[in-house]
Amino acid sequence: MSPWLKWHGPAMARLWGLCLLVLGFWRASLACPTSCKCSSARIWCTEPSPGIVAFPRLEPNSVDPENITEILIANQKRLEIINEDDVEAYVGLRNLTIVDSGLKFVAYKAFLKNSNLRHINFTRNKLTSLSRRHFRHLDLSDLILTGNPFTCSCDIMWLKTLQETKSSPDTQDLYCLNESSKNMPLANLQIPNCGLPSARLAAPNLTVEEGKSVTLSCSVGGDPLPTLYWDVGNLVSKHMNETSHTQGSLRITNISSDDSGKQISCVAENLVGEDQDSVNLTVHFAPTITFLESPTSDHHWCIPFTVRGNPKPALQWFYNGAILNESKYICTKIHVTNHTEYHGCLQLDNPTHMNNGDYTLMAKNEYGKDERQISAHFMGRPGVDYETNPNYPEVLYEDWTTPTDIGDTTNKSNEIPSTDVADQSNREHLSVYAVVVIASVVGFCLLVMLLLLKLARHSKFGMKGPASVISNDDDSASPLHHISNGSNTPSSSEGGPDAVIIGMTKIPVIENPQYFGITNSQLKPDTFVQHIKRHNIVLKRELGEGAFGKVFLAECYNLCPEQDKILVAVKTLKDASDNARKDFHREAELLTNLQHEHIVKFYGVCVEGDPLIMVFEYMKHGDLNKFLRAHGPDAVLMAEGNPPTELTQSQMLHIAQQIAAGMVYLASQHFVHRDLATRNCLVGENLLVKIGDFGMSRDVYSTDYYRVGGHTMLPIRWMPPESIMYRKFTTESDVWSLGVVLWEIFTYGKQPWYQLSNNEVIECITQGRVLQRPRTCPQEVYELMLGCWQREPHTRKNIKSIHTLLQNLAKASPVYLDILG
């Protein structure tokens, strides 16, 4: 064997790999302090021998200390001190536990840089005193101090005060050693001249004009004598303070309008605790228009603006230099108010070319005014020849409300020669005869068509030719439309509340090999696909269109024994290829086996001729995303009449637990949805919610998807890191999506990460960022969301436990179902 093969063959490659692995473990162990063990996020030192004498520090170029979230120290009798710089490197630290050790002293600034600390446990140490200054800047959930030999003094009186005023430390039996070296319950501690301080400001309210100066005075008192300091937050204006033992003053000069609404506090602090008195600063200033842009189209046309001013400015619009009189079709809407800043828009309902022009906004209050102008173009003037033909009659485009040229038009008609008038008269006679003949023919044709329609009321489905509207029964949700080949049908995004009906397809569901490997003999008798006669299906109107084909609202006869006909949603197959037909039949078998009260019901198929048809139950109120938006705080912007009632928290919990129930069922059947979102859930009567996906959502909600390559559309805003990076879809990835669905529900249908582009969303999710808690979301539900969004799939909450928790929360709040009317 050659020397090269001897040292570079496959066996040696495995040996080198093993050596590198051992070297990696050895290097990691060297980086961790003696008597401690380390991981990427945790340090624990529990071996008493040889033990540690100082707070553990990581070696340079080892694990990043910023990633450490928990430090556990136990049985370290020689650890006595935490110095100022011992903990500062662990800025991500959340849990610090030092128990059964020799800790005697903690430096005042030991935790100054550990703002993420939430849990501290110093049980059974040697602490005789502990100052509140260690913890005053922290938002602690737990501070456990039992088993320490505290000395009865004013230094620990703050612990007694803390127990009396708050629930933390919870149910702790704290003791201190009195002058006789006997244990005394901290609750009974009485120390003379040891009480809380007081602080008082001279003025409870402060109003000043921009650019002026003001001086605040504060007096403090208490025993022990407190320290006085000013908490000015992020005050922009220049300021300076002077303090003595019991008096202090704060002078603010050249006050900025940016400081209006900010709070200024005078704080008195001593060993026992602190007291503060606050004043709100109100700054009056002239208005400025900081933002005015060209109109954008959403539910209405909107010219967006932002105005600053205090007192609130009066707004006036001008159109082409003249005062714009607002009405219900053109009006100012203020959407967001932030003390002195107003975000809104000039809303225009269906503007035309008549509304094109210059729009000027003027904002005015007692301190001044500001104005800005924008040019708006909503649509071109009618008539395709206008732009290309300079001789096109200008009179066609005169403003209908300006009759100044009527006389000119009459004068021009008088200039026509008499011979032209005679020719025109002859042409008019011929036109009259032609109109009479055409009207007679049309009337006869209409009569024949009415007779044919009456005879064909229950005739064949008619999908090969134009699909007609058969009936107006049971369909008060929106007007019916005639649907024909080549005509423009109403899109699903423009329809009524039932505009989008979506059901499970092969696209978002990973094929279950256990299911597709079975034979017909293995299927249960009640799960065979039901075949529906084509003449029993009568179309009413088109609901939408996806990549697969169209979805129609229809009436289906003889489907249920107890009803002559029921409303259904039918999905047609556009692609008639052999592969598409095979997929169609496989999907039908799959859907037949998915039977649950919170999964959209699949009735069967129609395979008599083309196109192939799937029949699903009809959910009256359409997709959940539109339903949430229509019953949220912004519904007034979309409603044409009285806005619907806003969803309550209990109703949102009721919706959430139904979706979770459906996902528990899918997981039990070993199916992965891959596209769980509110747009793919449907709402029926009495707030009944079911999971589905007809695939139309990729067209209606195109901004929710991220195109990869030529055809693949991924819902990245609902996907976990492993699905984005490795296309790995599991039940755990569905759990992540369920967490996002909960976020959608409690934001009334907002798009996740709506303020970010798709690329920014991918970066955020892969870097570990999560969505913030919605304003209306209970803390328990947000913690549930966080449990769904754990980076490691195996650490995410179990789908059954999610459903159980949501079910319990929903039961605790009764649901009133009259919201749907």
Curated annotation (Swiss-Prot):
Residues 454-821 are cytoplasmic. Residues 474-497 are annotated as: Disordered. Glycans are attached at residues 67, 95, 121, 178, 205, 241, 254, 280, 325, 338, 350, 411. The keyword Translocase does not apply. The record marks 816 as: Interaction with PLCG1. Phosphorylated. Undergoes ligand-mediated autophosphorylation that is required for interaction with SHC1 and PLCG1 and other downstream effectors. Some isoforms are not phosphorylated. Ubiquitinated. Undergoes polyubiquitination upon activation; regulated by NGFR. Ubiquitination regulates the internalization of the receptor. This is BDNF/NT-3 growth factors receptor. The lineage of its organism: Eukaryota, Metazoa, Chordata, Craniata, Vertebrata. The gene is Ntrk2.
